[in-house]
């Protein structure tokens, strides 16, 4: 089961931060992350990074195993929850094969960190039940997500993270059912599965 944690400082070898644009100039947007912004911006510029929404770039780092830059597009004074949800989800989808990551995206409210958590969680889905059994064919999604925020010790933030876990768990269930071929998800097996789920309620 996917776990979502809160922290005031990044505690994972993989760090996810935002990358956006002010005019035509790239800018890194993050919270509670200790990174060499100037050097990273030089590298990103030389690589031809755009900072556009849905762009994801992964770079090795001295302080982290990996820094993941997820596009935020044009930088505004406030980022909408939907944009943050989308950015977190895009990054998570590029992290198959890794166990955990810290998401240090910019935010100003609990509603925004809730969106980050939901996006990261929903992006951490992979249906592998009927895939090949070799290691190369089995790339598991993130099993642990940490959201870096100054709201880490607040009750509202903790409630929002629990809600994000529940949303992800139930969404994954529906996706699994949709992705299971009819030859495996017969009416009888579906009934047994729903009874098992109902017994947990």
Report the location of each language-model feature.
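Short amphipathic alpha-helical segment within the helicase RecA-like ATPase core
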Residues: 1-201
């Amino acid at each position: 089961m996917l776990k979502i944690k809160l922290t005031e400082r990044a505690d994972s070898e993989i760090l996810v931060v935002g990358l956006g644009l002010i005019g035509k100039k790239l800018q890194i947007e993050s919270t509670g992350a200790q990174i060499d912004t100037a050097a990273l911006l030089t590298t990103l510029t030389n690589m031809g990074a755009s900072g556009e929404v849905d762009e994801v770039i992964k770079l090795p780092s001295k302080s982290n195993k990996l820094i993941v830059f997820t596009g935020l597009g044009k930088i505004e004074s406030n980022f909408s929850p939907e944009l943050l949800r989308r950015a977190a989800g895009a990054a998570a989808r590029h992290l198959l094969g890794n166990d955990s990551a810290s998401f240090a995206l910019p935010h100003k409210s609990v509603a925004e960190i809730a969106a980050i958590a939901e996006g990261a969680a929903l992006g951490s889905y992979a249906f592998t039940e009927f895939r090949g059994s070799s290691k190369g064919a089995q790339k598991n999604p993130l099993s642990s997500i940490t959201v870096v925020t100054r709201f880490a010790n607040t009750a509202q933030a903790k409630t929002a993270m629990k809600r994000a876990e529940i949303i992800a768990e139930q969404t994954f269930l529906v996706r699994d059912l949709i992705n299971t071929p009819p030859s495996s998800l017969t009416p009888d097996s579906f009934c047994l599965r729903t009874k098992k789920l109902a017994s947990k309620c």
